[in-house]
Amino acid sequence: MSDENENGRPGGRTPMTLKPRQGSVSAGVVKQSFSHGRTKTVVVETKRTRTHAPASGNLAAPSSAERRHGEAPAPRPAPPQGGGGGSAGGLSQEELRARQRVVDAAREAQARQVAEQAAAEARARAAQEAAQREAAAKAAAERAAAAPPPVAQAPAAPAPAAPVTPPPAAPQAPRPVAQAPVAPSAPRQDAPRQDTRAAAPGQTRTYEPSRDRRDDRPSTTTYRPAPQGDRPFNQRAPRPDANANFGQRAPRPEGDRPRGPRPDGDRPQGDRGGYRGDRPQGDRPQGDRPQQTVRYSALAPRPAPGARGPGGPPRGPRPGVPAAAPATPEIQRATRSAPRPGGGAMDRRPDEDDDRRKNAAPNKAVSRVKGAPQRREGRLTIQAVAGDGDSADRMRSLASVRRAREREKEKRRGGAVEQARVAREVVIPDVITVQELSNRMAVRGVDIIKFLMRQGVMLKINDVIDNDTAELVATEFGHTVKRVSEADVEEGFIGADDHDEHMDLRPPVVTIMGHVDHGKTSLLDALRSTDVAAGEAGGITQHIGAYQVRLKDGQRVTFLDTPGHAAFSSMRARGANITDIVVLVVAGDDGVMPQTIEAIKHAKAAEVPIIVAVNKMDKPGSDPTRVVNELLQHEIVVESLGGDTQLIEVSAKARTGLDNLLEAILLQAEVLDLKANPDRSADGVVIEAKLDKGRGAVSTVLVNRGTLKRGDIVVAGSQWGKVRALLNERNEQLQEAGPATPVEILGLDGVPSPGDAFAVVENEARARELTEYRIRLKREKSMAPVGAGASMADMMAKLQDKKLKELPLVIKADVQGSAEAIIGSLDKMATDEVRARIILSGAGAISESDVMLAKGAGAPVIGFNVRASAQARALAEREGVEIRYYAIIYDLLDDIKGVLSGMLAPIQRETFLGNAEVLQAFDISKIGKVAGCKVTEGVVRKGAKVRIIRQDIVVLELGTLQTLKRFKDEVNEVPVGQECGMMFAGFQDIKVGDTIECFTVEEIKRQLD
């Protein structure tokens, strides 16, 4: 019976709970441990019994001693439903008095029935005892024949309860009962019972919980009223005097009754049970009682008191215990309405109980109805707490039960309501993993994978997808997309353009360009009144220099001196890109040269105006007209010919024409209207960089806009640092540098590359972010060619590269620009057969780490305008590493070119001598085959190379003519028309008709172009 069915009834059970009961129930906690490692804490409830005095009027259940002596138990008082304050039994005084009146009426009715029943019982007792003994003996004989068990003393058969009479009387001595051996019974088949409610309408059955535990099983046996009618007299217990009253009966001794040896197997059935109507007469069904599995659930209602269990009949009073007195309708109503002291219903209606027990299958355990919710099974009992394995296995935790209830509620509601998706702005970088995308979208990764699978893309949770695919997924899930890139860190590095109202005039930046040895540096020295050219190695400029000249009128002009050698093409290009005006220096006696043409191309590419300075006009033979005509071939039209290019004749040595040159520069700057904003953060370009032993990384920069100050945080390429010092070209300390000012800055953590842009950033975090991104980008670019080459053409190119000879080199230069120029020149020397492979290049002195790196690669160390430290020199001597020093780039490139030329394979050149034809082949013992030949063309020479041709097929290539004889004499040469004998080294397959071609091979050494 479910909790819902009982809630509306007056005597219905209340829902079970694991909470400790109040009042008469004490609770404790017991911790269970299982073999599989789980532990469980259960609540143990112990009901405290309460004893009541007989004279108080509280008609509680009689004690076990009274029940043993055959007294009819009085109806149990029904406590009030409200549970308010009452007597000790839970009833108010008015209810107790009403209850007492009902009980007194019942006693009077029972007294009247005693006299009528006594005579009938006496007559039927003898016959019934005889029939019972005969049936018991027959059943015992049959069971003993099947499986003889040990014989034990049978318990006394129960007798019907004796009627209680009001007058007191002495208790009657118990009558001895015959004993018979009892064997395990067969499965009991319940005989059909008759409903006796029609015959005895005034009789009802009242259930009382048993207080006497006679075995270890949890008993739910209840007291039932004694059925009317005859019962076998031999099953009665010793009964007291019929005239004895409740208070006059002898008290029943406390404790369990003395037991004899318990018979093995199942006890005989049929001797227990409540009132079931008139029992059919005859032999009792034989067989053992069916074994039934009783399963209790903590969520299901408990069996009603008096119910034996699911699928089994209710138990009646124990043998020898009198049944309760028949109750009147008032007692029936009071009993039904009275709840159990511990909560819950105390009894069930007899008709429903009997019908349910009668229709239940005897061998079928209680199971869950198909489709019904699976509830928690297991019952909190002493057996479960004590370690009963079956009960412990059936127990489930309270949290599990709660989760099951939640699932049941969700099923009844039609399933959990799916949470509405919230549209978000998803930031998507260039590449992103599926896991990261799911986190940003707040969706499950498996949902994204399913969507991609429907699109035909099979991915795992850690796979990387591009931003286009990620945008498609995010849009499909209803989110908005914001695409970002790692390159976004570069945004704002160089500030926006300035407004005109913030602009001020700035000095012009002039780059001196031209061919080598045309007097560029000498001209700049004349303008600066210095002598820089005298201190240069080889009389040539190998570094880009930056100077600022202050004129007589206070104006300033910034000059950049670029090298004129072919190796410094990148420097010239860099100078053209950062300059405002290009001064093209052309020697009057030499004219336009290759580097002059290159400078013109750089200036045109940078869209920079050109001023032509014809130098060396003091030398005889200088012809400016020749220079003008040669410039016309390269689209340079001077003003004298109607063009816009100024041409100035100067002499750096005689210092003539310098003022005209400065005037032309200022005029061109005025036309350009050069302006910049000094009141902003500085940015510019790195002109040159080097590594100084005492000062560290030194970078020469040109400020384009803003003002660079000491203490600013500067990012230049992949290097950053705080400006510790600002130096001009005269090594003077500066506090700040304005627009178009070249300065040297100290404080960077490394040497930047020439041509890198620099700018001042707001903090160190921003500087680190920029440099880390640039370093990562550079590393990815350097590693990119490793994974290339998936096509067949690339694979063939790799196979050819394996035949390529390489010259490993470690190059250290004084400045980064010089190292860059050397590497560029070496790359131009490379051919399909040889090339120079740069292991390391940089600016600074040669260190021990450079020597060890060169030793591992088997490479020499090239020092350009630098020297090795003492420790590095000693290490190089011990390890056998060659160090070469150079001060002029010509010498360095010539030596490397010679080494690469020596690595080229020499050319094999053949010189034809003559042909001969084999006329006869002789096989001579101990010598081998000898060819008898006739020279048909030219001469044949001993020791020359031969090629044997047979039917237009070469059968011997590059053989050697080992022996040449004329008759019996060995000769060195046989001319045309004569016969001779020939023998070849390592070749015996000579046949008549073969053609022998004789020639010489000469090796020619190759040179790089």
Curated annotation (Swiss-Prot):
Ranges where the tr-type G domain occurs: 505-675
GO cellular component, one term: cytosol
Chain spans, region G3: 561-564
Bias kind Low complexity: ranges: 111-121, 137-146, 175-189
Residue numbers binding GTP: 514-521, 561-565, 615-618
Biased composition (Pro residues): 147-174, 311-320
Record bears the keyword Transmembrane helix: no
Segments of this protein annotated with the region G5: 651-653
GO MF term list: GTP binding; GTPase activity; guanosine tetraphosphate binding; translation initiation factor activity
Subcellular compartments: Cytoplasm
Region feature (G2): 539-543
Residue segments, region G1: 514-521
Stretch list, region Disordered: 1-415
Annotated stretches, region: G4: 615-618
Keywords assigned: Cytoplasm, GTP-binding, Initiation factor, Nucleotide-binding, Protein biosynthesis
Basic and acidic residues composition-biased segments: 94-110, 122-136, 208-218, 251-287, 346-358, 403-415
Pfam annotation, one family: GTP_EFTU_D2
Stated role: One of the essential components for the initiation of protein synthesis. Protects formylmethionyl-tRNA from spontaneous hydrolysis and promotes its binding to the 30S ribosomal subunits. Also involved in the hydrolysis of GTP during the formation of the 70S ribosomal complex.
Family: Belongs to the TRAFAC class translation factor GTPase superfamily. Classic translation factor GTPase family. IF-2 subfamily.
Stored HAMAP family: IF_2_B (MF_00100_B)
Protein name: Translation initiation factor IF-2
